[in-house]
């Protein structure tokens, strides 16, 4: 049952490898990869402490010890760094869910990824504010949708829930749009039942793929029972380096 997520992880790694290619098509050296990782880890740490608006290229330079020119060699701007961080966070989340839920179904793993992201946003205010910037950016949001399309494809291809390319895209757009709404709700003045909203999101995410209500109920119930696991995974994602 781990195979689908392993295939997915390879797909996301390939996306990362394409990012790491230089203009002549060669793969960057280990040293270049190390420098890029240092930039991303420093940016992630700053984002978690100060939020998106206060994290500047200058602060990333000071925190990472990497020269400004080197940062612009790898990334166009701060938004580009944030987009790369999100790619790594998704891959990290997938790996952790694969380790903790190896014997679970593709549907459960898909729901678990959604659950972990929303749980992190509910538990960490500064991360919540940073993610809202990402969701509000057309470029970054489009990248989020693309990542979730690849995740769904890796999980559901060759199953009864396999979709066409357009089907994967439409379903993912609905799910990520709903996740954006869940995130925005956390900033509303009215008191919010975040756990209830997350469960509604999971039901929608599974429902768009045609999952029957009885199976959805079972998955949601099990997701609810593993709250400690999601808290631990979320804490590791926020506090641990992206690239070791």
Task: Please tell me what each predicted stretch does.
Residues 1-20, 157-158, 188-244:
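C-terminal peripheral helix-coil segments that are non-catalytic and often amphipathic
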Residues 135-184, 196, 203:
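Amphipathic alpha-helical packing segments from all-alpha helical-bundle domains
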Residues 38, 46-80, 84:
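Helix-turn-helix
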Residues 97-101, 128-131, 185-190:
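Secondary-structure edge/capping motif, primarily at the C-terminal ends of alpha-helices
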Residues 35, 39-42, 171:
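N-terminal positioning helix adjacent to the helix-turn-helix/winged-helix DNA-binding module
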Residues 89-96, 120-124, 128, 151, ...:
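A short secondary-structure junction motif
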């Amino acid at each position: 049952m781990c195979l689908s997520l392993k295939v997915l992880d390879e797909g996301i790694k390939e996306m990362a490898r394409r990012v790491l290619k230089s203009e002549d098509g060669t793969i960057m050296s280990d040293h270049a990869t190390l420098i890029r990782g240092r930039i991303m880890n420093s940016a992630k740490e700053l984002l978690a402490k100060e939020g998106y608006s206060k994290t500047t290229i200058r602060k990333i330079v000071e925190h990472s010890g990497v020269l400004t020119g080197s940062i612009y060699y790898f990334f166009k701007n701060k938004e580009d760094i944030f987009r790369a961080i999100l790619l790594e966070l998704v891959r990290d989340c997938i790996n952790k869910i694969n380790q903790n839920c190896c014997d679970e179904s593709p549907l459960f793993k898909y729901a678990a990824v959604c659950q972990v992201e929303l749980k992190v946003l509910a538990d960490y205010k500064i991360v919540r504010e940073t993610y809202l910037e990402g969701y509000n950016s057309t470029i970054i949001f489009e990248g989020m949708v693309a990542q979730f399309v690849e995740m769904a494809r890796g999980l559901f291809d060759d199953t009864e829930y396999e979709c066409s390319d357009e089907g994967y895209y439409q379903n993912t757009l609905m799910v990520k749009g709903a996740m954006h709404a869940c995130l925005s709700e956390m900033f509303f003045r009215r008191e919010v039942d975040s756990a209830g909203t997350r469960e509604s999101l999971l039901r929608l995410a599974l429902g768009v793929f045609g999952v029957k209500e009885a199976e959805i109920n079972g998955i949601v119930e099990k997701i609810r029972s593993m709250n400690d696991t999601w808290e631990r995974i979320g804490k590791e994602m926020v506090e641990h380096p992206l690239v070791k």
